[in-house]
Amino acid sequence: MGIKNLSTRLVLALGASSAAASLVPRQTNGSSPVTSPYFQDVSDYLDSIVDELWPINKEIHDNPELGYKEVKAHKLLTDFMESHEGWNVTRSIYNISTAFVAVFEGSGDGPIVSFNAEYDALPGLGHACGHNLIATASVGGALATAEIMRAEKLPGKVILFGTPAEESLGGKVKLHEAGAFRDHNIDISLITHPTNGADTPYMITTSTDRFEVEYRGKEAHAAAGPWEGINAQDALILANNAIALMRQQTRHTDKIHGIITSAGSRINVIPALAEASFQIRSADNVALEQWTERVMKCFEAGALATGAELNLTMRPYGYDNMVNNDLLASSYAKHFTEIGGKVPSAEIDKLRDPDGSTDQGNLSHDFPSISPYFGITNENGTAPAGGPHTAAFEVAAGSRAAFDKAIMAAKGIAGVAVDVLTVDGLLEQINEEFEATKEKRRKRRSVFQISR
Protein backbone atom coordinates (compact mmCIF):
# COMPACT_ATOMS: atom_id res chain seq x y z
CA MET A 1 0.00 0.00 0.00
CA GLY A 2 1.46 3.34 -1.03
CA ILE A 3 1.71 6.12 1.52
CA LYS A 4 1.78 9.70 0.27
CA ASN A 5 4.36 12.22 1.38
CA LEU A 6 3.97 13.40 4.97
CA SER A 7 4.06 17.10 4.10
CA THR A 8 1.11 16.83 1.73
CA ARG A 9 -1.23 15.08 4.13
CA LEU A 10 -0.88 16.63 7.60
CA VAL A 11 -4.30 17.20 9.13
CA LEU A 12 -5.29 19.42 12.01
CA ALA A 13 -6.26 17.56 15.14
CA LEU A 14 -9.37 18.26 17.11
CA GLY A 15 -8.63 20.94 19.71
CA ALA A 16 -7.65 19.36 22.97
CA SER A 17 -9.99 19.73 25.92
CA SER A 18 -9.26 22.42 28.46
CA ALA A 19 -7.85 19.80 30.81
CA ALA A 20 -5.22 18.89 28.25
CA ALA A 21 -4.79 22.24 26.49
CA SER A 22 -1.20 22.59 27.62
CA LEU A 23 -0.36 19.05 26.58
CA VAL A 24 -0.64 19.23 22.80
CA PRO A 25 1.95 17.29 20.80
CA ARG A 26 5.02 19.09 19.54
CA GLN A 27 4.83 20.48 16.02
CA THR A 28 7.13 20.80 13.04
CA ASN A 29 4.92 22.95 10.81
CA GLY A 30 2.83 25.43 12.70
CA SER A 31 1.15 26.01 16.01
CA SER A 32 -1.91 23.73 15.76
CA PRO A 33 -1.89 20.16 17.07
CA VAL A 34 -1.38 17.59 14.34
CA THR A 35 -2.30 13.98 13.82
CA SER A 36 -0.60 11.40 11.66
CA PRO A 37 -0.89 11.79 7.87
CA TYR A 38 -1.85 8.15 7.45
CA PHE A 39 -5.50 8.08 8.48
CA GLN A 40 -6.85 7.79 4.94
CA ASP A 41 -4.73 4.68 4.52
CA VAL A 42 -6.10 3.31 7.80
CA SER A 43 -9.64 3.88 6.55
CA ASP A 44 -8.95 2.40 3.11
CA TYR A 45 -7.34 -0.71 4.58
CA LEU A 46 -10.26 -1.41 6.90
CA ASP A 47 -12.67 -0.93 4.01
CA SER A 48 -10.67 -3.54 2.10
CA ILE A 49 -11.04 -6.23 4.80
CA VAL A 50 -14.69 -5.83 5.82
CA ASP A 51 -15.54 -9.04 3.97
CA GLU A 52 -13.02 -10.84 6.19
CA LEU A 53 -14.26 -9.26 9.40
CA TRP A 54 -18.01 -9.67 8.89
CA PRO A 55 -17.97 -13.51 9.16
CA ILE A 56 -15.83 -13.25 12.32
CA ASN A 57 -18.29 -10.81 13.86
CA LYS A 58 -21.30 -12.89 12.85
CA GLU A 59 -19.84 -16.17 14.08
CA ILE A 60 -19.11 -14.76 17.53
CA HIS A 61 -22.55 -13.13 17.79
CA ASP A 62 -24.43 -16.24 16.71
CA ASN A 63 -22.50 -18.57 19.03
CA PRO A 64 -22.49 -16.85 22.44
CA GLU A 65 -20.20 -18.28 25.11
CA LEU A 66 -19.95 -17.35 28.77
CA GLY A 67 -16.85 -15.98 30.47
CA TYR A 68 -13.80 -18.27 30.50
CA LYS A 69 -15.72 -20.69 28.26
CA GLU A 70 -15.27 -18.80 24.97
CA VAL A 71 -13.68 -21.80 23.23
CA LYS A 72 -15.09 -21.16 19.76
CA ALA A 73 -14.38 -17.43 19.82
CA HIS A 74 -10.85 -18.03 21.08
CA LYS A 75 -10.07 -20.44 18.23
CA LEU A 76 -11.79 -18.25 15.66
CA LEU A 77 -9.87 -15.11 16.61
CA THR A 78 -6.47 -16.73 17.09
CA ASP A 79 -6.71 -18.62 13.79
CA PHE A 80 -7.76 -15.41 12.07
CA MET A 81 -4.88 -13.37 13.46
CA GLU A 82 -2.40 -16.13 12.67
CA SER A 83 -3.57 -16.11 9.05
CA HIS A 84 -2.22 -12.57 8.65
CA GLU A 85 1.45 -12.22 7.84
CA GLY A 86 3.73 -10.95 10.58
CA TRP A 87 1.52 -11.75 13.57
CA ASN A 88 2.89 -13.98 16.33
CA VAL A 89 -0.03 -15.50 18.26
CA THR A 90 0.19 -17.14 21.69
CA ARG A 91 -2.90 -18.96 22.92
CA SER A 92 -4.13 -19.60 26.48
CA ILE A 93 -1.79 -17.08 28.08
CA TYR A 94 -1.19 -16.78 31.84
CA ASN A 95 -3.11 -20.00 32.57
CA ILE A 96 -6.35 -18.59 31.17
CA SER A 97 -7.47 -21.02 28.49
CA THR A 98 -9.50 -18.54 26.43
CA ALA A 99 -7.08 -15.60 26.61
CA PHE A 100 -4.49 -14.86 23.94
CA VAL A 101 -1.99 -12.31 22.73
CA ALA A 102 -1.04 -11.46 19.14
CA VAL A 103 2.08 -9.36 18.49
CA PHE A 104 3.21 -7.53 15.36
CA GLU A 105 6.82 -6.32 15.46
CA GLY A 106 7.85 -3.09 13.77
CA SER A 107 11.23 -2.13 12.38
CA GLY A 108 12.82 -1.53 15.79
CA ASP A 109 12.20 -0.13 19.26
CA GLY A 110 9.35 2.34 19.48
CA PRO A 111 5.93 2.90 21.06
CA ILE A 112 3.92 -0.20 21.95
CA VAL A 113 0.23 0.27 21.21
CA SER A 114 -2.28 -2.30 22.42
CA PHE A 115 -5.88 -3.22 21.72
CA ASN A 116 -8.21 -5.38 23.84
CA ALA A 117 -10.77 -7.74 22.31
CA GLU A 118 -13.73 -8.96 24.36
CA TYR A 119 -15.89 -11.90 23.26
CA ASP A 120 -17.83 -13.28 26.24
CA ALA A 121 -21.63 -13.27 26.35
CA LEU A 122 -24.30 -12.85 29.02
CA PRO A 123 -26.19 -15.73 30.66
CA GLY A 124 -29.55 -16.11 28.96
CA LEU A 125 -29.09 -13.01 26.79
CA GLY A 126 -26.30 -13.92 24.39
CA HIS A 127 -24.33 -10.96 23.04
CA ALA A 128 -26.61 -8.36 24.58
CA CYS A 129 -23.56 -6.26 25.43
CA GLY A 130 -22.21 -6.44 21.89
CA HIS A 131 -18.86 -8.02 22.68
CA ASN A 132 -18.81 -9.44 19.17
CA LEU A 133 -18.60 -5.83 18.00
CA ILE A 134 -15.86 -5.02 20.52
CA ALA A 135 -13.80 -7.95 19.23
CA THR A 136 -14.38 -6.84 15.64
CA ALA A 137 -13.34 -3.25 16.30
CA SER A 138 -10.19 -4.24 18.19
CA VAL A 139 -9.13 -6.88 15.67
CA GLY A 140 -9.74 -4.46 12.81
CA GLY A 141 -7.96 -1.62 14.59
CA ALA A 142 -4.92 -3.77 15.35
CA LEU A 143 -4.68 -5.09 11.78
CA ALA A 144 -4.97 -1.60 10.28
CA THR A 145 -2.30 -0.22 12.60
CA ALA A 146 0.03 -3.09 11.72
CA GLU A 147 -0.54 -2.48 8.01
CA ILE A 148 0.64 1.12 8.35
CA MET A 149 3.61 -0.07 10.41
CA ARG A 150 4.49 -2.60 7.73
CA ALA A 151 4.10 -0.20 4.79
CA GLU A 152 6.05 2.63 6.39
CA LYS A 153 8.60 0.43 8.20
CA LEU A 154 7.71 2.11 11.49
CA PRO A 155 9.41 1.16 14.78
CA GLY A 156 7.35 -0.13 17.68
CA LYS A 157 4.85 -2.92 18.26
CA VAL A 158 1.15 -3.54 17.83
CA ILE A 159 -0.37 -5.92 20.37
CA LEU A 160 -3.85 -7.43 20.42
CA PHE A 161 -4.92 -9.00 23.70
CA GLY A 162 -7.77 -11.48 23.79
CA THR A 163 -9.41 -10.63 27.11
CA PRO A 164 -12.18 -13.05 28.13
CA ALA A 165 -14.78 -12.81 30.87
CA GLU A 166 -15.44 -9.08 31.13
CA GLU A 167 -18.97 -9.68 32.37
CA SER A 168 -18.44 -9.56 36.15
CA LEU A 169 -15.58 -12.08 36.16
CA GLY A 170 -12.70 -9.65 35.67
CA GLY A 171 -10.75 -11.20 32.82
CA LYS A 172 -8.58 -8.13 32.32
CA VAL A 173 -8.01 -7.76 36.06
CA LYS A 174 -6.86 -11.37 36.26
CA LEU A 175 -4.53 -10.90 33.28
CA HIS A 176 -3.23 -7.63 34.74
CA GLU A 177 -2.49 -9.19 38.12
CA ALA A 178 -0.63 -11.99 36.33
CA GLY A 179 1.53 -9.40 34.56
CA ALA A 180 0.22 -9.69 31.00
CA PHE A 181 0.18 -5.99 30.17
CA ARG A 182 3.34 -5.00 32.03
CA ASP A 183 5.27 -7.96 30.63
CA HIS A 184 4.55 -6.62 27.15
CA ASN A 185 5.51 -3.05 28.19
CA ILE A 186 2.44 -1.46 26.62
CA ASP A 187 2.32 2.32 26.30
CA ILE A 188 -1.42 2.75 25.65
CA SER A 189 -4.50 0.53 25.96
CA LEU A 190 -7.38 0.92 23.49
CA ILE A 191 -10.85 -0.60 23.28
CA THR A 192 -14.36 0.50 22.23
CA HIS A 193 -17.90 -0.31 23.34
CA PRO A 194 -21.30 -0.27 21.61
CA THR A 195 -24.25 1.62 23.09
CA ASN A 196 -27.81 2.56 22.21
CA GLY A 197 -26.89 6.18 22.88
CA ALA A 198 -24.64 8.76 21.27
CA ASP A 199 -21.12 8.36 19.94
CA THR A 200 -18.49 9.66 22.36
CA PRO A 201 -14.74 9.29 22.90
CA TYR A 202 -15.34 9.15 26.65
CA MET A 203 -16.54 6.14 28.61
CA ILE A 204 -17.45 7.34 32.10
CA THR A 205 -17.96 4.45 34.50
CA THR A 206 -18.14 3.65 38.19
CA SER A 207 -15.84 1.76 40.49
CA THR A 208 -17.58 -1.33 41.77
CA ASP A 209 -17.32 -4.28 44.13
CA ARG A 210 -19.56 -7.31 44.68
CA PHE A 211 -20.33 -9.05 47.94
CA GLU A 212 -21.75 -12.39 48.94
CA VAL A 213 -23.78 -12.03 52.14
CA GLU A 214 -24.76 -14.85 54.46
CA TYR A 215 -26.69 -14.70 57.73
CA ARG A 216 -26.87 -17.78 59.94
CA GLY A 217 -29.50 -18.07 62.64
CA LYS A 218 -31.33 -20.90 64.35
CA GLU A 219 -34.31 -22.92 63.20
CA ALA A 220 -37.46 -23.13 65.32
CA HIS A 221 -41.13 -23.91 64.75
CA ALA A 222 -42.73 -20.67 63.62
CA ALA A 223 -45.94 -21.32 65.61
CA ALA A 224 -44.96 -23.55 68.52
CA GLY A 225 -41.74 -21.84 69.59
CA PRO A 226 -40.61 -18.95 67.40
CA TRP A 227 -38.83 -17.36 70.39
CA GLU A 228 -36.40 -20.27 70.33
CA GLY A 229 -35.19 -19.34 66.84
CA ILE A 230 -32.92 -16.68 65.33
CA ASN A 231 -34.38 -15.45 62.06
CA ALA A 232 -31.66 -15.11 59.41
CA GLN A 233 -34.18 -13.81 56.90
CA ASP A 234 -35.13 -10.97 59.24
CA ALA A 235 -31.47 -10.01 59.56
CA LEU A 236 -31.17 -9.76 55.79
CA ILE A 237 -34.41 -7.80 55.45
CA LEU A 238 -33.30 -5.37 58.17
CA ALA A 239 -30.00 -4.80 56.39
CA ASN A 240 -31.76 -4.27 53.08
CA ASN A 241 -34.20 -1.80 54.64
CA ALA A 242 -31.36 0.10 56.31
CA ILE A 243 -29.66 0.42 52.93
CA ALA A 244 -32.90 1.61 51.35
CA LEU A 245 -33.35 4.31 54.00
CA MET A 246 -29.70 5.37 53.71
CA ARG A 247 -30.20 6.18 50.02
CA GLN A 248 -31.83 9.48 51.04
CA GLN A 249 -28.44 10.71 52.26
CA THR A 250 -26.24 9.41 49.46
CA ARG A 251 -24.76 10.97 46.36
CA HIS A 252 -26.59 10.13 43.16
CA THR A 253 -23.44 8.39 41.94
CA ASP A 254 -23.44 6.00 44.93
CA LYS A 255 -25.49 2.96 43.97
CA ILE A 256 -26.25 -0.44 45.41
CA HIS A 257 -28.33 -3.28 44.05
CA GLY A 258 -28.80 -6.82 45.18
CA ILE A 259 -30.88 -9.97 45.14
CA ILE A 260 -31.85 -12.44 47.85
CA THR A 261 -30.72 -15.84 46.62
CA SER A 262 -32.12 -17.94 49.48
CA ALA A 263 -34.09 -17.33 52.66
CA GLY A 264 -35.76 -20.43 54.01
CA SER A 265 -37.84 -23.11 52.32
CA ARG A 266 -40.78 -23.75 54.69
CA ILE A 267 -43.13 -21.08 55.93
CA ASN A 268 -43.63 -22.70 59.34
CA VAL A 269 -39.90 -22.83 60.14
CA ILE A 270 -37.84 -19.84 61.27
CA PRO A 271 -35.14 -19.52 58.55
CA ALA A 272 -31.70 -20.43 59.84
CA LEU A 273 -29.95 -19.34 56.65
CA ALA A 274 -30.39 -16.33 54.37
CA GLU A 275 -28.10 -15.49 51.46
CA ALA A 276 -27.83 -12.58 49.05
CA SER A 277 -25.58 -11.03 46.43
CA PHE A 278 -24.99 -7.27 46.37
CA GLN A 279 -23.09 -4.91 44.12
CA ILE A 280 -22.03 -1.40 45.09
CA ARG A 281 -20.84 1.35 42.75
CA SER A 282 -19.46 4.83 43.12
CA ALA A 283 -17.92 7.52 40.95
CA ASP A 284 -14.32 6.63 41.77
CA ASN A 285 -12.19 4.49 44.03
CA VAL A 286 -12.02 6.94 46.91
CA ALA A 287 -15.80 7.44 46.96
CA LEU A 288 -16.30 3.67 46.76
CA GLU A 289 -14.22 3.15 49.89
CA GLN A 290 -16.40 5.64 51.78
CA TRP A 291 -19.63 4.14 50.43
CA THR A 292 -18.47 0.62 51.30
CA GLU A 293 -17.94 1.56 54.95
CA ARG A 294 -21.51 2.84 55.22
CA VAL A 295 -23.01 -0.21 53.52
CA MET A 296 -21.07 -2.61 55.74
CA LYS A 297 -22.59 -0.98 58.83
CA CYS A 298 -26.06 -1.79 57.49
CA PHE A 299 -25.17 -5.46 57.17
CA GLU A 300 -23.66 -5.46 60.65
CA ALA A 301 -26.83 -3.83 62.00
CA GLY A 302 -28.91 -6.73 60.69
CA ALA A 303 -26.79 -9.15 62.66
CA LEU A 304 -26.77 -7.00 65.80
CA ALA A 305 -30.54 -6.54 65.84
CA THR A 306 -31.42 -10.21 65.38
CA GLY A 307 -28.53 -12.09 66.91
CA ALA A 308 -27.76 -13.77 63.60
CA GLU A 309 -24.19 -14.46 62.53
CA LEU A 310 -23.00 -12.43 59.54
CA ASN A 311 -20.51 -13.75 57.01
CA LEU A 312 -19.75 -11.30 54.22
CA THR A 313 -17.13 -11.83 51.53
CA MET A 314 -16.08 -9.45 48.78
CA ARG A 315 -15.68 -11.21 45.47
CA PRO A 316 -12.26 -10.82 43.82
CA TYR A 317 -11.58 -8.76 40.70
CA GLY A 318 -13.55 -5.61 41.48
CA TYR A 319 -13.61 -2.93 38.78
CA ASP A 320 -12.11 0.56 38.95
CA ASN A 321 -13.64 3.66 37.38
CA MET A 322 -12.47 4.57 33.87
CA VAL A 323 -9.74 7.23 33.71
CA ASN A 324 -9.87 8.69 30.19
CA ASN A 325 -6.80 10.24 28.60
CA ASP A 326 -7.81 13.53 26.96
CA LEU A 327 -5.15 13.47 24.25
CA LEU A 328 -6.12 9.96 23.17
CA ALA A 329 -9.78 11.01 23.22
CA SER A 330 -8.99 14.11 21.15
CA SER A 331 -7.19 12.00 18.55
CA TYR A 332 -10.13 9.58 18.37
CA ALA A 333 -12.65 12.41 18.01
CA LYS A 334 -10.65 13.93 15.17
CA HIS A 335 -10.51 10.70 13.20
CA PHE A 336 -14.07 9.61 13.97
CA THR A 337 -15.48 12.90 12.71
CA GLU A 338 -13.31 12.68 9.57
CA ILE A 339 -15.33 9.62 8.50
CA GLY A 340 -18.71 11.18 9.23
CA GLY A 341 -19.13 10.58 12.95
CA LYS A 342 -20.39 13.20 15.38
CA VAL A 343 -19.23 13.62 18.95
CA PRO A 344 -20.00 16.25 21.61
CA SER A 345 -17.39 18.67 22.85
CA ALA A 346 -15.12 17.21 25.51
CA GLU A 347 -16.14 19.89 28.02
CA ILE A 348 -19.80 18.86 27.79
CA ASP A 349 -19.16 15.16 27.34
CA LYS A 350 -17.22 14.78 30.57
CA LEU A 351 -20.09 16.21 32.62
CA ARG A 352 -22.08 12.99 32.16
CA ASP A 353 -22.78 10.88 35.22
CA PRO A 354 -20.99 7.52 35.31
CA ASP A 355 -22.93 4.45 34.30
CA GLY A 356 -21.97 0.80 34.42
CA SER A 357 -18.54 -0.62 35.13
CA THR A 358 -15.79 -2.35 33.15
CA ASP A 359 -12.52 -4.11 33.84
CA GLN A 360 -10.92 -1.77 31.29
CA GLY A 361 -11.15 0.76 34.12
CA ASN A 362 -8.49 -1.13 36.05
CA LEU A 363 -6.10 -0.85 33.11
CA SER A 364 -6.86 2.85 32.72
CA HIS A 365 -5.41 3.50 36.19
CA ASP A 366 -2.08 2.05 35.11
CA PHE A 367 -1.87 2.88 31.39
CA PRO A 368 -3.15 5.79 29.27
CA SER A 369 -6.45 4.54 27.89
CA ILE A 370 -9.76 5.28 26.22
CA SER A 371 -12.86 3.20 25.54
CA PRO A 372 -15.06 5.21 23.16
CA TYR A 373 -18.76 4.45 22.89
CA PHE A 374 -20.26 3.96 19.43
CA GLY A 375 -24.03 4.03 18.98
CA ILE A 376 -25.57 1.11 17.10
CA THR A 377 -28.89 0.61 15.34
CA ASN A 378 -31.07 -2.16 14.04
CA GLU A 379 -30.91 -3.08 10.37
CA ASN A 380 -33.64 -0.54 9.57
CA GLY A 381 -31.73 2.30 11.23
CA THR A 382 -33.82 2.48 14.40
CA ALA A 383 -32.16 2.49 17.81
CA PRO A 384 -32.60 -0.70 19.84
CA ALA A 385 -35.55 -0.50 22.23
CA GLY A 386 -33.26 -1.22 25.16
CA GLY A 387 -29.66 -0.58 26.08
CA PRO A 388 -26.89 -3.09 26.77
CA HIS A 389 -27.95 -6.20 28.68
CA THR A 390 -31.39 -6.33 27.04
CA ALA A 391 -32.82 -8.68 24.43
CA ALA A 392 -33.40 -5.77 22.05
CA PHE A 393 -29.74 -4.81 22.19
CA GLU A 394 -28.70 -8.39 21.44
CA VAL A 395 -30.71 -8.28 18.21
CA ALA A 396 -29.19 -4.95 17.18
CA ALA A 397 -25.66 -6.17 17.99
CA GLY A 398 -26.04 -8.82 15.29
CA SER A 399 -27.06 -6.43 12.53
CA ARG A 400 -24.93 -5.39 9.59
CA ALA A 401 -25.62 -1.77 10.54
CA ALA A 402 -24.02 -2.34 13.95
CA PHE A 403 -21.05 -4.05 12.29
CA ASP A 404 -20.58 -1.06 9.99
CA LYS A 405 -20.49 1.22 13.04
CA ALA A 406 -17.92 -1.06 14.69
CA ILE A 407 -15.75 -0.61 11.60
CA MET A 408 -15.97 3.16 12.09
CA ALA A 409 -14.85 2.69 15.69
CA ALA A 410 -12.00 0.45 14.49
CA LYS A 411 -10.86 3.23 12.17
CA GLY A 412 -10.96 5.69 15.06
CA ILE A 413 -8.83 3.66 17.47
CA ALA A 414 -6.43 2.63 14.70
CA GLY A 415 -6.02 6.32 13.90
CA VAL A 416 -5.17 6.95 17.55
CA ALA A 417 -2.59 4.15 17.57
CA VAL A 418 -0.96 5.40 14.36
CA ASP A 419 -0.81 8.92 15.81
CA VAL A 420 1.08 7.57 18.82
CA LEU A 421 3.47 5.72 16.52
CA THR A 422 4.17 8.63 14.18
CA VAL A 423 3.52 12.07 15.72
CA ASP A 424 6.67 13.48 17.26
CA GLY A 425 6.42 13.86 21.02
CA LEU A 426 2.79 12.74 21.31
CA LEU A 427 3.47 9.74 23.54
CA GLU A 428 5.53 11.87 25.91
CA GLN A 429 2.68 14.37 26.13
CA ILE A 430 0.17 11.55 26.73
CA ASN A 431 2.30 10.24 29.58
CA GLU A 432 2.66 13.72 31.08
CA GLU A 433 -1.11 14.09 31.13
CA PHE A 434 -1.52 10.59 32.55
CA GLU A 435 0.83 11.25 35.44
CA ALA A 436 -0.80 14.62 36.16
CA THR A 437 -4.39 13.37 36.16
CA LYS A 438 -4.17 9.76 37.32
CA GLU A 439 -6.66 9.25 40.11
CA LYS A 440 -5.67 7.79 43.44
CA ARG A 441 -6.03 4.01 43.50
CA ARG A 442 -7.18 2.22 46.58
CA LYS A 443 -5.32 -0.93 47.43
CA ARG A 444 -7.32 -3.71 45.85
CA ARG A 445 -8.22 -6.39 48.37
CA SER A 446 -8.46 -9.83 46.78
CA VAL A 447 -10.68 -11.05 49.62
CA PHE A 448 -12.48 -8.82 52.12
CA GLN A 449 -14.45 -10.52 54.86
CA ILE A 450 -16.63 -9.54 57.80
CA SER A 451 -17.75 -12.06 60.39
CA ARG A 452 -20.00 -10.99 63.25
What is each model feature region?
Residues 1-24:
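Fungal secretory targeting signals
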Residues 2, 22-158:
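Acidic/His- and Gly-rich active-site-bordering loop/insert found
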Residues 25-30, 34, 233, 237-452:
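Metal-dependent amide/peptide-bond hydrolase catalytic core
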Residues 98-104, 120-128, 132-133, 148-271, ...:
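Histidine/acidic-residue-rich, glycine-tolerant segments that coordinate divalent metal ions
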